[in-house]
Amino acid sequence: VQVLAYLPKVSSIQLGSERSDLGWDSVRAIMDACPNASVSYTFWLYDKEFSTVDTTINLSHIPVEDGGAQVMQAMACMPDLVSVDMDSCGVSNEDMAAIRDAYPDVKVVWRVWFGDAYSVRTDVERILASQPSVGGMLDRYNSEALKYCTDVKYLDVGHNDALDDISFVAYMPKLEVAILAMDNWSDATPLASCTELEYLEMQTTLCTDLSPLSGLKKLRHLDIAYIVDLD
């Protein structure tokens, strides 16, 4: 690594593969020594080949049993990485969220399950979950995973009598249409974070205070029919 200090104009470095016993610490040291160079190093994640110059990691439906630890290690040496797809890899939502939070500039996607039978990828833009007879009745516990779906623009979780908490919408800043009617929630505070919201149905809920909606400047349609305790 020290000799690289004498090669300031080097633009490309080929390191071979991890089968050469060159560890991640050495790869990182070389990258740090030559910040302007493209450093190519071939490695394997869960029996699939990748390179440090790749822009994507696709592990969709490949079992991952270490909570994504190897992925995190590799991501630290992939400066051009744009996206990581870990759909149905068996990693917990908490571990996947930790990966996403550690690399906010990388699109990290996985699959979440909610209700009894609903599942979506975290990059989904449209969620329809208003048929308890099909996907199960939503409640505050089995709907919590929806908070990981931060790209949602259209959300329909109406007709869920047991849904008494909509905290998950606070994590949906792109939300434009929300159908939250005929549920059992009372606190509209999470909606204050949905500044792109244009259409909102919340009729026949237990909401008592609309003040959290005061900052929603793009809101054009609001249905509050049959809310009997509204101040």
Q: Model-derived features: where do they sit?
A:
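Concave beta-strand-loop units of leucine-rich repeat
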Residues: 1-22, 32-94, 101-190, 196-212, ...
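Intrinsic low-complexity tandem-repeat regions in disordered proteins
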Residues: 24-27, 96
